[in-house]
């Protein structure tokens, strides 16, 4: 009897332990897991707030069509750019709708740091030489530093070497200079759309008459719309607040195609010139009258100096 009693007591305890393991322990473990998940989620949110994520690829290259974008060439990277503009399509079949004529520019852009870019170039239009620097002042970011916009400053100097002044006038070398200063304000709204505004001032060292101002103000607007991983639609428009006589606002629409280290840009524009002084203040054709140029830009990057990970820009 005593043995039977002991077995019954042990059996009841064993049954209680089984029930505890089956019903109570999983519940407690689940509750602990939920608490752990909550703690991990809170930790992730805390780390995200303490970390700053810089927004990248607002635009796919440093030139939208004619104008600069917010993007910089990376540190130690050389960007070779070839820009080509054919004649206007309204010249007809005799000039093969503009393909018999061409204006081009070749440029070299180099990233000194991830914030500072410098560049030089030569254009056939007015035989212009140009140089510029671009500095990224603010970078769009989220997290610890929440910055809704990216902001850059661009200063460009252009020297016109074309000898076309009428006799008996003689211009000094400094009279052939133009300067452009720009502030670029850009935002990447999502992976499919980016927008930028570009307030601009172009200065002429000399103008034909005293009735024409030396300084010209304009505002540019540009966008990028993503179609696929490697294809984007682009557009830019520069509105002149005070126009050079006989000129119109520059409008360009295009498509960008990425292929490895190359970016191909194909577009239509009413601007013949490629530098800021040329396409902003010297566009003399209108879209509605067929003064449209087909053009393309080719960009190829080369890593000249591999930056050290310890370098802060």
In which residue ranges do the predicted regions lie?
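Membrane-helix boundary/juxtamembrane motif in polytopic membrane proteins
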Residues: 214, 246-248
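A mid-sequence, solvent-exposed acidic-amphipathic segment
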Residues: 192-239
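Sec/Tat signal peptide C-region and signal peptidase I cleavage site
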Residues: 26-31
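Hydrophobic core
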Residues: 19-25
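Sec-dependent N-terminal signal peptides
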Residues: 12-19, 56
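Flexible, glycine/proline-enriched loop segments at strand-loop-helix junctions
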Residues: 168-173, 210
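N-terminal secretory signal peptides that target proteins for export/translocation
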Residues: 1-11
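Transmembrane beta-barrel domains of Gram-negative outer membranes and organellar outer membranes
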Residues: 32-169, 177-181, 186-197, 201-205, ...
């Amino acid at each position: 009897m005593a043995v039977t009693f002991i077995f019954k007591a042990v059996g009841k305890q064993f049954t209680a332990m089984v029930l505890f393991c089956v019903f109570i322990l999983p519940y407690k473990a689940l509750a602990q897991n939920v608490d752990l998940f909550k703690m991990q989620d809170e930790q992730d949110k805390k780390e995200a707030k303490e970390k700053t994520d810089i927004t990248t690829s607002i635009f796919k290259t440093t030139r939208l069509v004619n104008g600069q974008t917010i993007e910089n060439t990376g540190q130690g990277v050389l960007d070779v750019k070839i820009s080509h503009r054919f004649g206007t399509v309204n010249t007809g079949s005799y000039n093969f709708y503009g393909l018999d004529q061409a204006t081009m520019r070749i440029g070299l852009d180099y990233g000194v740091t991830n914030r500072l870019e410098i560049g030089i170039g030569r254009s056939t239009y007015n035989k212009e030489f140009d140089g510029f620097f671009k500095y990224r002042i603010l970078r769009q970011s989220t997290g610890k530093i929440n910055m809704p916009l990216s902001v850059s400053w661009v200063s460009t100097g252009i020297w016109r070497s074309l000898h076309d002044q009428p006799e008996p006038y003689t211009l000094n070398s400094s009279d052939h200079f133009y300067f452009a200063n720009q502030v670029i304000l850009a935002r990447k709204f999502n992976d499919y759309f980016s927008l930028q505004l570009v307030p601009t001032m172009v200065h002429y060292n000399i103008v034909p008459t005293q009735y024409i101002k030396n300084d010209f103000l304009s505002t540019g607007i540009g966008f990028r719309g993503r179609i696929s991983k490697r294809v984007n639609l682009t557009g830019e428009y520069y509105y002149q607040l005070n126009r050079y006589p006989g000129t119109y606002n520059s409008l360009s629409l295009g498509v960008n195609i990425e292929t490895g280290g190359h970016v191909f840009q194909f577009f239509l524009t009413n601007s013949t010139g490629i530098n800021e002084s040329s396409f902003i203040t010297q566009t003399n054709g209108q879209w509605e009258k067929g003064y449209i140029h087909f053009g393309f830009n080719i960009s190829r990057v080369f890593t000249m100096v591999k930056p050290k990970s310890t370098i802060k820009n």
